[in-house]
Amino acid sequence: MTIHYEELNGKNFNTYSLDHFVRHQRVIECWRNVDGQWKLIPIEFEENWTVEQCQKIAADVALHMGNDQTAIGAFDGEEVIGFITVSHNIFGNTAKYVELVCFQVSEPYRGKKIGKTLFYKACEEAKRLGADKLYISAHSSKESQAAYKAIGCVHACLLYTSPSPR
């Protein structure tokens, strides 16, 4: 397995590029703010993207890449096995933020530092765009939050409750 990373464009990414992507997550607990304290609450569900959902996400990535977002892909051969997108819109009063819009690694490739590499590439892109920080609105599951914490993320000083800054 030789993984390579490159910016997504019309030559290496299209609506069908995620047809074999495995977006699966079994959630048992999620973080919730209860009376001002973060607590793990039992919330069980399973997420599985269908091919149609993968195509919808891919079409959205393709629409924005190179325009108002930068998209970076992780490839195993020619197959997209992970991707991350960063908005070009800088916002914020206390710091210059850009939003990490989408961040996914196909299930068979998790735990291999592919997500960490993609995340660091997104940080480099944010700096290139002139931002100080990435704004991340992440899944509240125990596992997702642990993954972000493991790569050095902390709770934001700036919180948007709605709508997304995009």
What does each of the following model-derived ranges do?
Residues 127-137:
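Conserved GNAT acetyl-CoA-binding A-motif
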Residues 140-158:
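Conserved active-site alpha-helix within GNAT-family acetyltransferase domains
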Residues 160-165:
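Conserved small/polar residues in nucleotide/adenosyl-binding loops
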Residues 20-96, 101, 106, 120:
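Acetyl-CoA-dependent GNAT
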